[in-house]
A protein has these predicted regions:
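Generic hydrophobic alpha-helical segments
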Residues: 43, 185-186, 203, 321, ...
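Terminal catalytic/cofactor-binding subdomain
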Residues: 1-167, 173, 324, 328-337, ...
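Conserved phosphate-binding loops in nucleotide/dinucleotide-binding enzymes
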Residues: 108, 184, 188-189, 316-325
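Long, well-ordered mid-to-C-terminal structural blocks that present hydrophobic/aromatic surfaces
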Residues: 272-356
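Loop-rich catalytic cores of soluble enzymes, especially ATP-dependent carboxylate-amine ligases
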Residues: 103, 125-126, 130-132, 136-307
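Structured core elements
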Residues: 35-37, 178-180, 313-315
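Short, aliphatic-rich beta-strand segments
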Residues: 98, 255, 313-315
Length: 441
């Protein structure tokens, strides 16, 4: 037996992490993460991890050419690189993620992204590979996608595939665009978390980029949303108490504590922990250091639409081309970092219920951009939120919203644009247009 932690002590292990990230408004930044599929340029066949011609070889070549990047190895395999807060990491199916060091300036973030892409394409071009930003691999069957050689991924795969019939698809076939935003206080945490939870059906729907999976056209919309809804319900979606009057940082901590961490990564060999909760397993830790390690893991192995760490991670958008992705980042900055906009959003979504959010997700799944949610159509939500966001941005950053405005005014989403291009010229040419290569206009 380890130390007997009180409920309050367990909560504090988590709330200390969240509160440790609080910053003054004048220092708030935005941090984008873009996940890509590595594909063969000619065939658009997916490139997997193993070997010198795989994603592993791409990272190894990158490290040889850029020795100032710090490598991360797992069980002898290179799985990540980091430099000055920018990183290149891999998702379980070798989706390649670029995380950009946060900045107040979206223009600086675009330049950072372009610099990483330029360095990657020095390697990819001779190999005949490209990076493609789309929410779900349109072709490759699940069984043809090996996981990275990490024992923890095997444990996650085994556990979550028992909880949801699309868990294996989540790990192997999906790709996202995520944005991290700063928080200033407990009150700011609660207001941002609630607003973002309420906005989640809107962002899932308007950034849907998936017309096909495993070679079959999809009748329903919002494929990534539905994959997450059928992965492991206790660790996905939104915490059930988010719209309760007394929701707090402690409430979020309680939700994390009630979730099984799947395995224990601290203090030696990784071992599976089944359905035991983080709260239960904390009682077996001997030291504060071991408990903090376990809590850090527990906060990372939940996958809600909005995940709290030292920042809030917004996880409800498909991977999409940069013009739309950075439009989304600008949109979120303009909405969340402007006090007038936050007050208006809180008024719009008060009162609110988890069930209403779920119904909104159902409407997006069934009807796409022409679906209806919380008193309006998704397209009107999108255009209205863009207008609000412009009020919270400089004229220069407001221009990043223009591609989204054009998209939604035409009743389009990334999915409908891609489907139309596929119908005209086939998948190979259509996906080449979605290659992540030149992102500076």
């Amino acid at each position: 037996m380890g130390k007997r932690w009180t409920v309050e002590e367990k909560r504090r292990l988590i709330t200390n992490v969240i509160r440790g990230g609080y910053t003054d408004r004048i220092r708030w930044q935005v941090g984008p993460e873009i996940e890509h599929f590595v594909m063969e340029r000619k065939s658009m066949k997916r490139v997997m991890y193993p070997g010198e011609k795989g994603v592993e070889g791409i990272l190894e070549t990158f490290l040889r050419r850029h020795a100032d990047w710090t490598p991360t190895y797992d069980e002898g395999h290179l799985i990540g690189l980091e430099k000055l807060g920018n990183s290149i990491t891999l998702e379980p199916g070798a989706q390649l993620e670029t995380s950009l060091a946060p900045s107040e300036s979206l223009r600086i973030l675009l330049h950072r992204y372009q610099e990483i892409l330029d360095a990657l394409y020095e390697i990819l071009d001779p190999m005949g590979y490209v990076l493609v930003t789309v929410g779900v691999d349109p072709f490759t069957p699940i069984d043809a996608i090996p996981l990275l050689p990490k024992h923890r991924y095997e444990l996650m795969d085994a556990h979550m595939s028992q909880k949801g019939n699309l868990a294996r698809a989540m790990m192997r076939q999906s790709a996202a665009f995520q944005v991290s935003v700063d928080v200033g206080s407990d009150a700011d945490f609660v207001s941002k978390y609630r607003v973002l939870a309420a906005l989640s059906p809107i962002f899932y729907t308007l950034f849907d980029s998936v017309p096909q999976r495993e070679g079959k056209a999809l009748e329903k919309f919002n494929a990534r949303q539905e994959i997450w809804r059928h992965t492991d319900p206790v660790r996905t979606g939104i915490p059930p108490t988010v719209f309760d009057p007394d929701f707090s940082v402690e409430s979020y901590a309680d939700w994390v504590l009630s979730t099984p961490p799947i395995f224990v990564p601290c203090g030696g060999a990784i071992k599976a922990t089944g359905d035991r909760t983080l709260s239960d397993i904390l009682n077996e830790t001997e030291t504060e250091e071991e408990a903090q390690c376990l809590v850090k893991h527990g906060m990372s192995i939940v996958f809600p639409d909005i995940r709290a760490k030292q920042i809030l991670e917004i996880r409800v958008m498909d991977s999409v081309p940069a013009s739309w992705a950075f439009g989304a980042a600008a949109m979120l900055k303009g909405l969340l970092y402007n006090m007038n906009n936050m007050r208006r959003l809180q008024d719009m979504f008060t009162p609110m219920q988890v069930d209403w959010v779920e119904r909104g997700k159902n409407s997006g799944r069934d009807n796409g951009i022409q679906g209806y949610y919380h008193s309006d159509y998704f397209v009107n939500w999108g255009l209205g939120l863009l207008a609000m966001a412009r009020e919270g941005l400089s004229v220069q950053e407001g221009k990043l919203l223009d591609p989204l405005e054009i998209l939604w005014k035409n009743l389009d989403t990334p999915r409908s644009v891609l489907a139309r291009n596929v119908a005209k010229e086939g998948w190979t040419k259509a996906l080449r247009k979605w290659e992540a290569r030149h992102v500076l206009s």
